[in-house]
Amino acid sequence: MDLGEIEKDFTKIDEYFFDACNIKSYNYNGTYYCCKNISSTHFTKLMYLIINEKNSTNGHQKIIKYLKKKINVKNPSRINRQNDEGWTALMIASITCGQWCSIETVRLLLEHGANPNIQEKNGLQLSGIKSQLAHIISLICKTMRQKNSNPENGFTALSLACAVLDTGESVEVVELLLKYGTNVDSINHNGETALIITCQNSKYFHSIFVIDLLLQNNANTLHKDNNGFTALIHAVSHCPLNIVKLLVKNGSDVNATDNEGKSVLMHSTKNSIDIVKYLLKKGAEINHKNNNDINVLFFASKNHVKSDVIMFLLAKCSNPNEINTNKNAVLAHVCRQFNHHKNDIDTVKILLENRANPNIIDDDSRTILMDICTDYQNENSLDIIEMLLKKGANVNATDIEGRTALNYACMSINNKITIKIIKLLLKYNINVNHVDNDGAHILIDLCRNYSRYSLKVVKLLLEHGADVNITFGNKKWTPLFFANENLFSSSEKDPERCTKLIDLLIHYGANVNAVGKYGNNILMEDTTRNLECPNSITKHLLEKKINVNHQNDNGDTSLLLVYERHELERAYSIAQFLLEHGCNPNIINKNEHNILTILNNDIFWNFEKVIPHFKLFLNYNFNPNIYQIYGCHFILINVLLI
């Protein structure tokens, strides 16, 4: 926001405040504004006259007349009375000069003994500010944040004047206050002096004149605020070079550090390369490290600084692969940013061109590529991944869990960016048949953790030669088993999506009659679950010619397993479904067990409930003459033949 816009906005807000608050009769218990956003009660009459000076006829003359009253002449200390917020008349005049009152009023107060060193005691607060005023209040926001607030140290008239340097009157106010003996190094709640406050607001044209005034009056350039920031640290972050030069010329320490050990040089990287070069010329230590053992190159990389600064620092810091205590090289540090900034792409490019190692790993043997594929996926990530791969990043590197970048990308499928990342990894020939330390194939992971975008990725992997019949775990399940299980294990229960995955696997050669560890096929797994069966997936598998009479290692069929695992009521509908699709009710397993032997107890104790089952079997070529159980054979035959 330029000066013209600021003045225009102040004019609008002046009208708002005067109309809303200030043009009303004086009342000691009334509420009035000390400045644009701070209100208080218990205003003195002098304060009231000051805030209304420019909005009333002969406003300044009214102030002169008031100060000449006998009560004020006999009691000169009355001029320093404070309102409920701890503000004096001089404070109010200093911060509103040029807007609500005149520079002559500030001078008049000082001539009548106003004390420029009184500090407000309640602390400046920003609560209750109207939203339409926020862009104006930002002029003084930095000086009002209350950190480690101490009621003994508040803002003085000088620090308030330095908080708003948008007009020429602000400079005159500072000059007057200094002339009348204000303490140039008085500190506020945040440990900030007038010099520090001015450097925070130094984007305004008049700031350099005020800084020069403060320095001429021996302002302490080495003082640190509560965060350990000196005026120079604040200045190098955003001020123009001429202000930085002025501070250094007047004794500022170019190697000062804040509470986190960050140096002036580190903070300067966020500004411009000219300031970085100037500080180094003046003796700034380039090899300094902060409390986290991070050097200036690390710090600059972390803060998305411009590429010209990175390039310059690389020329000064010869080893871009230097490791800090967290074993993060500069390259890894940049690539592991949560949200990749456009400047990060330029930084990565520069680092790689200057011999940075794209295969550096952390304590878990994770590469930069793995980390980006896991947590830091956005459009800029694609550019960074391709740069790493072009510069020799090992696409098939594994971590301590035996996982590759492709494993991690497939674990994090949540948007279209992931699909693009996987395509990029495939372009650089990542191994689609890699198996991790647990024996899990990527295709297995995708099928057992099926999500919205999984189908596209599975198709990509199959197109690039992924083994569709790979097995995993003690059960020796193939991807088809896991795809089928999704209907039962997924909270979404989406049969249509599961069907699409099953069809895709079968299209690329999945064996529909594959068996697990004990010889069970998928149909057996489905029919023996304590869940809804038959279901759309089971029916679909039968359409795909799964063997309904397949026998497992024990010789059991799906029909035999149904009666081994389920109650009679539950078994009937499943048995009917299997028989309708060609299941043979006469098969005997390796233990010489058949349907009658399995239903042995039910024949004796639930005979009436068994009858419907055997009638069902008879409809599907059941041969009762081959069975005989403890003398019940003839009774059963007679019943069934009735």
Curated annotation (Swiss-Prot):
The keyword Transmembrane does not apply. InterPro entries: Ankyrin_rpt, Ankyrin_rpt-contain_sf. Pfam families: Ank_2 (PF12796). ANK repeats lie at residues 42-76, 85-118, 153-186, 190-224, 227-256, 260-288, 292-322, 326-360, 365-397, 401-434, 438-470, 475-514, 518-550, 554-587. The keyword Repeat applies. Disulfide bonds: none annotated. SUPFAM superfamilies: Ankyrin repeat. It comes from the Viruses. Keywords: ANK repeat, Repeat. This is Putative ankyrin repeat protein L91. It comes from Acanthamoeba polyphaga mimivirus (APMV). The lineage of its organism: Viruses, Varidnaviria, Bamfordvirae, Nucleocytoviricota, Megaviricetes.
